[in-house]
Every structure is written in structure tokens, then in C-alpha cells.
Amino acid sequence: MFDRQNTLAKTDPQLWEAIQNENKRQEDHIELIASENYTSPAVMAAQGSQLTNKYAEGYPGKRYYGGCEFIDVAEQLAIDRVKALFGAEAANVQPHCGASANQAVFLAFLKPGDTFMGMSLAEGGHLTHGMALNMSGKWFNPIAYGLDKNEEIDYEQMERLAREHKPKLIIAGASAYSKKIDFERIGKLAKEVGAIFMVDMAHYAGLVAAGVYPNPVPHADIVTSTTHKSLRGPRGGIILMKAEHEKAINFAVFPGLQGGPLMHVIAAKAVAFKEAAEPGFKDYQKQVVANAKALAETLIARGLRIVSGGTDSHVMLVDLRAKSMTGKEAERVLGEAHITCNKNGIPNDPEKPMVTSGIRLGSPAMTTRGFKEAEARQVGNFIADVLDNPNDPANIAKVRAQVAELTKRFPVYD
């Protein structure tokens, strides 16, 4: 019998200490990793609930195990809420992550060796869209499209390649692309060449839900996403689809790819979808975009180049070559100043993937803690101050003190 008073601090002091240290890091550092955010206490409460105890292979009303009547309620809430949020005909909320969601689409519609198209990883795509080391690149025949001379998606190249190769699947979406994507144009192309059109909106989902970024659902056969990042939910995946594809996708997720769903995570997804439907979430996402633009403009004014010239979303790539600095070096020195970001390749990057010539910055997390344009500009100046003089410990210490002053004014969790 378990004692509810037997806290984690008592049960496992070592782990508790690590968690508390991570909590302090999150409070004290400015988080600029574009794929990270802070979830609400309600999301965390659902994820830490007794639903973690229940096996529930199958779908609501059609389970392999008994005792799922309340589990069905939780999953159906998640399904109904995410469909309403994005205007989708059908949804699967069971994928454990975005990569699993993408793999399920491949399993549902492709056979090994089939041809598909996705955005080049080197120019802003995602590893699950055809990287040679990923399952998508090993088992299938990926054809990559990229960027034009303005560092925006080269739709003419995409159209030419699609007409030449006749892919069975066309993927839109990116992990490091700051501009809006023309989903309508790509959807028309997919119909023309007889391809399934899939959009991976993992990075943009929160913005889409709030109406500040184009919604791919009306134009795509399938839309996959994570539920964290800009959507601000737990770490997990979802698949939205036309009703005609529901059976194929559901069968691909279970039993094709996964066994038992993570019901505690699905419950947390349901909470996040409810939060995303509230009026305040739209205001939050508008601020996410405003903060990203303010950050980008500040960095440009301080002499840094932003890939594609700026941002229409929450994310941007900073080209560091003018500073004679690698992304790896910038990530490290900014971390010393308590500014967290990630190294990232830029288009036609001459450096290795674990070194890179750029960093990726995103505004969702700093916006969650209450930053507005003024604070975003401050952050931009902090970054520029560090990168202007990265080898001076006194300079790093000065910026770190300024970061501490700012983060104390805007706690993540009161």
C-alpha cells in the first residue's frame, strides 16, 4: 500500500536534487531553444496522475484490456478537443512523439523503396523527412527540395522534382525555417502528381491553433505534430487526417507501430488542447511572433545576419560566420551567460552537423514567462554583447548578472 505522504524527496533524494537543480536552471536561464517551452501545472498534474498505471491497447470503445471506461473518457476528450482546435475531420492522439507520428504515416501509405519528397535537412527540414541515417532515408527513396536564392522554399524546384519523380508522399514542414509555408500551393501540387500530402507542423502548431500561422489542415491529407514546442503541452505526438485516412492511420499507430498508449500523457494532451482553445492562448501566440520579430530585428541591428532575412513565426537561424565563430562555440558561451540555445546548421553550411555555423533561436518559452517586445530586445542585446566579446570572462559575468535581474522579474512558476 502506498502512502501519499511519502514524497519523491523522501523516496529518492538524489533524483529529487537533480529535479530541483533543473527547476532552478529553468528559472534562472533564458530559454531560447525553439522546440522547448514550459507546460502549465495542470498539464504536469495530468501527466503525473494514476492514469500512468493503466494499459489500454486499442482505441476508445475498442480495447484489448478491460477496465478502460474512464481511460476512454480521457482519450476521447483529447481527440475531440484537438479536432475542434485545428478543424480536423479525424485525429489520433496516441503517438509517443512527433517522429512516431511521422513513422506511422510512412507505415500507412508507403512500402520500402517508395519515393517521397521532403525538405532538405541541410536547408531547414527535419531528420524524419529523409535524412540518410534516419529510417525515412534508409527504408525509402527521399527526394529533397530546398531553398531559393532568397533562402525561402523553392516552390518551382519542388514542382519540377514532383513532376519528374512522381512521389507517393510529399512532406511540408521544417525544424528550422522561419517563413510562412504555402500549404495551399503544395496541396495542389500533390493532387496534380497523385501524392499523399503530409504536413509536419510540429514547430508551428501553437501558432496555427491561434490563427497567427497558416493552417495546413484544409489543404493536407495528413497533418502530424508534436504537442510540446509552441503548443505548450506534454512531450508527445498527434496525427490529424481526412476521415478517409482514419482507418489506415489508426491501424498504423496500433498495432503497426506502438503497443499500449501512454494514457497519462494523453490526458495531459487533453489539458493542453483545452488551454489552447482559450482566448488567452491567442494573445500568447501573437506575442510569441511579436517577440521573435523584435529579437530578430535587434540582432540584425547589432550586425548579425538572420537566415531568410527575418521571421514570420517563432523561430530564426542566426548566421555566425561574420563573427568567425561556430554554433558550437556560441551555444557554449551563451550558456555561460545563462542564455540557452542550440547550435544549428545554416543553408550550405561548411561546418559539420555537431559544429555548425549558426544557432537557432525561438521565442515560445521566453514569452510564456511574460516577456514582451522590450524584454525580447534586451535578450537580443544580451546575445550580441556576448558574441561581440566571447572570450572576456568579465563580459560574460556582466551579461549573466543582467540575465539574473531579468529572470527574477519574470518567474516561470510563481
UniProtKB/Swiss-Prot annotation:
Task: Write out the annotated subcellular location.
Answer: Cytoplasm
- What EC number(s) would the UniProt record show? 2.1.2.1
Q: In which pathway does it act?
A: One-carbon metabolism; tetrahydrofolate interconversion; Amino-acid biosynthesis; glycine biosynthesis; glycine from L-serine: step 1/1
Spell out which residues are annotated as carrying N6-(pyridoxal phosphate)lysine: K229
Question: Pfam families, per this entry?
Answer: SHMT
Q: How does it assemble?
A: Homodimer.
What does the sequence similarity comment in the record state about its family? Answer: Belongs to the SHMT family.
Q: What does this protein do?
A: Catalyzes the reversible interconversion of serine and glycine with tetrahydrofolate (THF) serving as the one-carbon carrier. This reaction serves as the major source of one-carbon groups required for the biosynthesis of purines, thymidylate, methionine, and other important biomolecules. Also exhibits THF-independent aldolase activity toward beta-hydroxyamino acids, producing glycine and aldehydes, via a retro-aldol mechanism.
| Protein name in the entry | Serine hydroxymethyltransferase
Q: What species is this protein from?
A: Polynucleobacter necessarius subsp. necessarius (strain STIR1)
